[in-house]
Amino acid sequence: MKVEKTVWNGKEGYLLQNESMEVFVNPEDGMNIYQMDWEGRQMIAWEEERYQRKATYGVPVLYPTPNRSEELKIQAFGRQYDARMHGLVKNRPFEVKAAEADGQTALVTGVLLWNEAQPDFPMFPFPSILSITVKALPDEVVWSYEVENCGEGEMSYGIAVHPYFNKREQAVKITVPAASVMEMTEEKIPTGKLIPAGETVPDLRTPALVDSLSLDHVYTDCQAGAHAEIFYNDC
């Protein structure tokens, strides 16, 4: 196991390595996982073109408003705030608090202080600390987070990751262990109303070809302990 600070594709960040995994994380760019290789296969591939045009790439962190909201507004504790799809932190710099390796694990932990020094604080005026850890294990990458409420009142938030897995020119299939899907408007705003999976969009509890799907939906009502899965021909 090894972790080192390095320059990769012209970007400074941290390379986590073991016998089967290589994971490059850039704390200065929202703790984004730029690339993830497993046994020589690029499972998440760096996309310079998307980076240059400021699109999403890698594994961006979406916090505190990961999804769309009606008229770009959210309601919280009796007040209305401006919102932004994909959140406010996906390109913000995180401070590295740990970068270490032992015989089983290589990891990097980054921390973002969300306070009045942040340019978008008025959009989410709740002082807090977001900590993210990316950990490389043998044949596994674990992404985890913690949110600490530093304010005096209540705080609510949403968080998600948006991984760009590489199809690698294969007939990739996916499963999602969700029994329901949220209804959404023509503008793709989730309404919160749940409908059975398969009624209007595919039921992904059985494998489906990615190339056959066109989805921008919220799948939910998941079986406890189950995971979404991606199936490659050579894995």
Where do the language-model regions lie?
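Glycine-rich, pocket-lining loop/helix-strand segments that form or immediately flank
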Residues: 42-55, 88-93, 175-180, 190-193
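Acidic, contiguous internal or C-terminal segments within carbohydrate-active enzymes
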Residues: 27, 114-157, 161-168
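Extended, loop-rich substrate-binding clefts of extracytoplasmic carbohydrate-active enzymes
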Residues: 1-4, 77-138
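Short solvent-exposed loop/turn micro-motifs enriched in small/polar/acidic residues
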Residues: 6-9, 65-67, 89-92, 125-129, ...
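Short hydrophobic/aromatic-rich beta-strand segments that constitute the beta-sheet cores
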Residues: 25, 35-36, 110, 142-144
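Hydrophobic residues embedded in beta-strands of well-ordered beta-sheets
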Residues: 14, 104-108, 141-143, 228
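Active-site/ligand-binding surface loops and adjacent short beta/alpha elements
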Residues: 154-155, 164-235
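Beta-strand-rich N-terminal accessory domains
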Residues: 1-60, 64-73, 80-84, 226-235
